[in-house]
């Protein structure tokens, strides 16, 4: 399977509604991906003269470049992490910033990337940026049992983190964990029968934990939340879409702290979630949450 399988952007209408009446001129999309949100924003807002889109996934950027060809004079794409975007961005640059956190449908559907437990014979990679960093396989084969357990606990909130880590280390003594099937085999005796009967795959939390660790998503999110308020012009808005509590909680707390410091106000007192119609059409959208913060019009 290839990256040509389209990613369906979530909460598009709701994201657009947060910027209507603002006439943004300079916009930043730090997770441009395949360009779904970008296409919608550039179509909806002719006022946007410059749309800076960045992503760590080179294959996604290639798709985005093709998708956004009709807007090529208004788009600037960059291969960059949140940290690298920060080094390239001056304070007070943007009227709006959008972040769509987590893994995309396109990445999940490409079994060769190792994000999904469906591709049994494919390598456990899980890197969003395949040009650098450790793969999930390298993590599982090189870290100590205690370190692996901490990953499963802290980034996956897996209740059986100790047992899962012990099973991984026991398995790798006989055979390296190189593929999705290897990880399944390594943890086959960990989960009780009731976990196996659930609709949610028992390895879901472990896959989440490995993905977050491999891509340093927590550290990257901290950089974003420490920096994005500075990137905004007075009256600018930061919109963040998250898909799990590990991402949503820091966003919620950062917005509350920024409001308490007088940096602006939270526009989404009640978090925005997908409609029933959207979750029916795109089941992967069901856990999405959208929050938005508006920077004060006065310098603080």
Swiss-Prot record:
Pfam family, one: Methyltransf_5
Catalytic reaction list: cytidine(1402) in 16S rRNA + S-adenosyl-L-methionine = N(4)-methylcytidine(1402) in 16S rRNA + S-adenosyl-L-homocysteine + H(+)
Gene Ontology MF, one: rRNA (cytosine-N4-)-methyltransferase activity
Known EC number: 2.1.1.199
Binding, S-adenosyl-L-methionine: 35-37, 55, 82, 100, 107
NCBIfam families hit by this protein: 16S rRNA (cytosine(1402)-N(4))-methyltransferase RsmH
Family: Belongs to the methyltransferase superfamily. RsmH family.
Function: Specifically methylates the N4 position of cytidine in position 1402 (C1402) of 16S rRNA.
Protein name: Ribosomal RNA small subunit methyltransferase H
UniProt gene name: rsmH
